[in-house]
């Protein structure tokens, strides 16, 4: 007997004789089948001109292992939108994780390198296989709490490095710290490096002891990226304004020998075995479910400039559990704001056509996101939740317009919660102006409003809560932002002053953007050279008004004291700034332009 997986119903709405067509999906039923059915109904004309098409997710967990794809054929219309909704707001989850099961005690061989004091509390289990491959991860969650990987010191603590040797591509640390590493070939230890306004995650290649020093080298390509790129690099022995002498800091992670605190874990390779130090009484088997993420993305909207995806609303959906493993393959060295360096180096002779004083070049990539959108128009998110994510939350990459993220909640996000717009990635040198021939290539008329963003940059400290790059007519308003390791809300990219050529000015991509009525607090918790609100480049007609900014972080391992409530970084110009509330007048300016209007 065949059973229908998806139920389709016609139900009356109190909307001027309009009908709603509803496709209901229960947990365990395939989400992609629901969207295919909706696509076919539109193709065959089964939906009236004024009918709303609802795809309703029943309460519970809807697990996926590959991203749900939406294409132009999935589009609605202004009169007949497609609404993807939870049966009850926040109670239906699109989830990229699965529960770890089969916990057992480790064998003698598996205990190799584990500290003896940890062994009575240690449990192991096999990572699941998905599509024929063992799941590799850098994230685990227990009852919604991100579990820390095994580390030399707690992950909110760091230790000062002794030297940063660019010639030999080495970082020097006290030898006593490196003796902890087990040299077990089934584990890949790595180093977290704190460097000015960013971090680097570097896989360790070799440790050479030299008296009281440990000289550490790293795998490629991150070794080349870390030691060749000039900004930002670690500092050694800098003197602060208050007379303190500081050096950049580090931590060691990912080795079985570092398992010494309850809740810590590590994964071996290539068998994927998960090692976990029980926090339960008496070191008992973990009683609360531990989730391993298996999906890198949950939703991918694939439109284009010529054929956008449009008129779709996600309403009340909870998005949870994505995996981020890029550093396991190539390390992670960022330029700024969580954008990874692909190649960067100092110029022997400074100068590029658009800036004679520029002394470096850099090409960057883009971090992954749980929900990624290309060519979207009127694709909106309302009352959604984005939690327990390996990297970013929502990313409007390019060619998107009139999209809203409204009344949403973001918490425990590995990198940036909301990304919008072009950031000069790929083959576009990141300092070179982005001047698209068509304004439609930009993200414009975008809104992020009334959202609550808490605890971002959990994996990459250099990320911000909300970041809009080359955008126009974009509003970020009435959001509550807290728990940022670096800056809170960022607007602009490129380090670009107003162009002198009229043709370039007509095509200028950043203008008429507004940061209004946001409440940002508890920012700069780990990295400085930051602001609660942070801007770059010339943006005529833009404003920063009516924001409440407070509680800047101390960043105990920062090597500079550049932390501001509003940071107008290089070439910021064209803004009106007024009526912002902050404990003290602390606005940083770095080579700002002549067209600023700042009122106390």
Predicted regions and their residues:
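Sec-dependent N-terminal signal peptides
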Residues: 4-14
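Boundary at the C-terminal end of the N-terminal hydrophobic targeting segment
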Residues: 18-20
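Extracellular polysaccharide-degrading/modifying enzymes targeting complex plant/algal/animal polysaccharides
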Residues: 25-375, 380, 426-437
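The right-handed parallel beta-helix/beta-solenoid scaffold, focusing on the short coil/turn
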Residues: 51-53, 60, 66, 80-82, ...
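Extracellular beta-strand solenoid repeats
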Residues: 56, 63, 69, 83-85, ...
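Short glycine/acidic-rich loop motifs that flank beta-strands on beta-rich extracellular proteins
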Residues: 66-67, 296, 323-329, 368, ...
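Extracellular beta-rich repeat passengers
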Residues: 145, 153-154, 321, 325, ...
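Right-handed parallel beta-helix
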Residues: 310-321, 357, 377-391, 400-415, ...
